[in-house]
Amino acid sequence: VARDRAFCFYYEDSLDLLRQLGAELVPFSPLADEKLPDGVQGLYLGGGYPELYAARLEENHTLRRQIRDVVYAGMPCIAECGGFMYLTQSIAGRAMVGALPGDCFDTGKLTRFGYITATAREDNLLCRAGEQVPMHEFHHWDTPQPGDAFGAEKPSGKQWRCAYATDTLYAGFPHFHFYAKPVMAQRFLAACRKETL
């Protein structure tokens, strides 16, 4: 679990659920650590403020390269909002992990702010096709390539597509709470253990 000043937004209840399901959560700092902790079987890159620390994140070439390599190799990874931004090509012109397309930029205002219902368009790490999850977006930054693995709908009826998702990845601006759909936590841990659920 990425935990430092750049990555600090997590629902503690969600982390507690992962622990209750048997996960050992090992913190690391994308700002300070040169490599991932030994033996990790999955990544959780939460929200936060990577844009405020983009220069320092960019300087950590070794960890950025390792994270890109393990994501490409299929290590299960959840990356919400700031964590998603970190996986893209860049934030404000500063090189990031580069595992996903897109360059993040400051819109100067809240973008797609509020609660949404996200519907999985295909089976993925956390959801099966057609499953719906309550989520929310809260960010000033955006990218021209936010992904299209989920359909998002606000209570007002406004719709768009969001997030990248494969059998080993969820990465997008929307945040979720594992207790909204606990099977997502079970699926994430099963993927980390290389089990079928």
Predicted region positions:
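Phosphate-binding active sites in nucleotide-utilizing proteins
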Residues: 1-2, 6-60, 65-70
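Short, glycine-/Ser/Thr-/acidic-enriched flexible segments
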Residues: 5-7, 32-33, 48-51, 84-85, ...
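Structural motif
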Residues: 24-26, 41-42, 75-76, 97-98, ...
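Hydrophobic, well-ordered secondary-structure elements that form the walls
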Residues: 43, 80, 97, 138, ...
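Amide-donor transfer/coupling interface in amidating biosynthetic enzymes
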Residues: 105-197
